[in-house]
Amino acid sequence: MTSNSIGKIFNFTTWGESHGKAIGCVVDGVPSNINLTEKDIQPYLDKRKPGQSKFTTQRKEEDKVEILSGTFEGKTTGHPISLIIYNQDQRSKDYGDIKSKFRPGHADYTYWKKYGIRDYRGGGRSSARETAMRVAAGAIARKIIKNKIKNQVVITGALIQIGNHKINYDNWNNNFIPKNNFWSPDKEIIKIWENEIQTARKSGSSLGAIIEIRVKGLPAGLGEPIYEKIDSDIAKALMSINAVKGVEMGNGISSVYETGISNVDEMRIKNKKPLFLSNNNGGVLGGITTGQELITRFVVKPTSSILSPKKTINTKLKETTISTKGRHDPCVGIRAVPVGEAMVATTIADHCLRFL
């Protein structure tokens, strides 16, 4: 009944709840003699932590990570690496009204049916609070990728759509992504998104989002055919993130609007090396990397914790209504950007250790 771990060689297990004393993870399979301290992990956690802008939850968590094991004198020992972050800003009183009610769109009902008990405070184990530890594991994964692949591998996540408003790809600027609260590559979309989120928040609602992850520098040949395809493993990793309802590679779903002529990635030779004339398949063919940029996207549904009253039932199977109080993201997709990067990084690191 447990499924709190992911990965084969690079494997990590997360633990902890939203309003518990702490959250943490144990990362196994990390080779020895890799430089690693808290300073290597903290910058990635700072990207994800809550309370950084008016467009995310106002819960204040410093998310200061502590390494408990698996390193000695600033280097990995080859043994399990234990990480911990202490929760600091729980407000469990906000959830008293939903103790016996199921929030529509949340895991409240399904956890109750499966386990016969649930931590109603902030969603407990099903809360996105857990994703901080995924980001920590992702930071370690990046160190492994750097150690295993000679080329510089760059993993870049960006928010490309909120609600009905999508970026203009012609405006894509990697340098702008870390300079705004949305991780947007398009400067022109910011004001539109700000207005949309404010409108949704004032109406007691929320918005969904799409995040794109790009990986440059991967060699051709990474991944295994059929049941261990690198794209299927990435899809599994991304689908495991809270509120994610869809994943695609390359043109993905929009491929249905193409033909075999327009969607195929033709090839030539340049400087005695293979050259692809397009990248409609997102850098993966047959589950194996082509050496092109790997491109994947995932869809995050609108936050289910909203102020607007909704119909639901309670633990006595009686009909009732619910209005969720507390501090919640009006668009949870914003903080999902570094989480998506981390899950792609952990998948690539696992494949590097398995097949390189």
Predicted regions and their residues:
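A short glycine/serine-rich beta->alpha loop
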Residues: 11-16, 119-130, 220-224, 279-284, ...
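N-terminal, positively charged regions that mediate nucleic acid binding
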Residues: 1-59
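Glycine-rich anion/phosphate-binding loop at the beta-strand->alpha-helix junction
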Residues: 18-21, 204-207, 211-319
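Internal helix-turn-beta structural module
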Residues: 11, 303-356
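Glycine-rich, mobile lid/loop segments that gate access to catalytic sites or pores
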Residues: 113-226
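Alpha-helical support elements that line or immediately flank enzyme active sites
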Residues: 21-33, 129-153, 228-236, 292-294, ...
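Short acidic, glycine/tyrosine-flanked loop/strand segments centered on an H-E-D-like triad
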Residues: 99-125, 310-330
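Glycine-rich, N-terminal phosphate-binding loop and its surrounding beta-alpha-beta segment
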Residues: 45-104, 108
